[in-house]
Amino acid sequence: ESGAGDDTVIGDNGNAEFNETAILTRIETTAPTIGGSDTISTGQGTDIVLGGYDTDTIHTYDTSNTSDSTENDSDKVIGDNGKVTFENDGSISVFATTNAGTGAKDEIYTGNGGDIIAGGDGDDEIYACVISSSSTCNGNDQSRDIVLGDNGQATFDTHGILRKFISSDYGHESTLEANAAYTDTIHTGGGDDIIIGGIQADIIESGAGDDTVIGDNGNAEFDIPSWLDIDVQLKTPSDGLFTSADEWSIAADGNLTVFTFNDILPAIHREMAQSIRD
C-alpha cells in the first residue's frame, strides 16, 4: 500500500531503469513464472502498476469512497507480466503485456482519469472508473480509457500520443487453442473509451461517451495526432475463429461503434455490427 502520490509498483519480480536526470525510461516484470497473489493499493496519483505472476487485486484509487469525483489521474496498469517504456522526457512510448500464458485472473480498479489497462491472462475484472456501492461505474469519469481484456500492446509517438492499439492474437486466430483466451468483465465510465475484449465471451459495459469496442481480437490505428479528436481506423480478423458471444451495455446518452463476430448485441447495435461485417 503506497498511498497518494505518483507511484511505480511491480507486484512480483521486475526491473526499473532511469536516465541521467532520474526520469523513468523503462519498467518491466522479470522471472514471469515466479511470484504470488498480490494486493496492491496506490491511492491517488498518476500510477504505474505491473501485477506480475498469479492472481492480483490492484487499486489505484481509494475504493472506499464510492462518490469520489476528484480522482482524475491517468494510471497505467498491467494485471500480469508486461513492460512500459518512456521517452527521455517521460512521455510514454510502449505499453505491452509480455510472457502470455504465465498470468492469472486479476481484479483491477483504476478510478477516474484517462487510464491504460491490460488485463493479461485469466478471467479478469476491470473497472476503469470509480465504482458505486452497487459495483457499477458512478458516472463521474469523463476521460478516455484504453482497455484490453487479454494480451496486447499500445504504441505511442514521441509526444506520448497513442498511435496503435492491438491485441496479441490479432492475425493469429488460426493457430490459437480454444483455451488460449479468457472471459473478461470490463466496465468503463464516461468519456470516449476504446476497448478490445480479446477472444472468448467477454462482458463489456461502457458508460456515456462515444465509445469504440472490438469484441474479440483487433487493431486500432490512430491517424490524427490529437488526444481530443482522433480518427480511428479499426481492423478485425475475418475468420472469427474461437470467438464467443459477448454481452454489451452502453449508457443511453452515449454512442457505440462495435466491431465484433457472433456477439450478443442490442438490436440497434447488432444491425450496425452486421453492416460493418458486410
List each model region and its residues.
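Extracellular repeat-rich scaffold modules on cell surfaces
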Residues: 42-44, 110-113, 187-193, 197-200
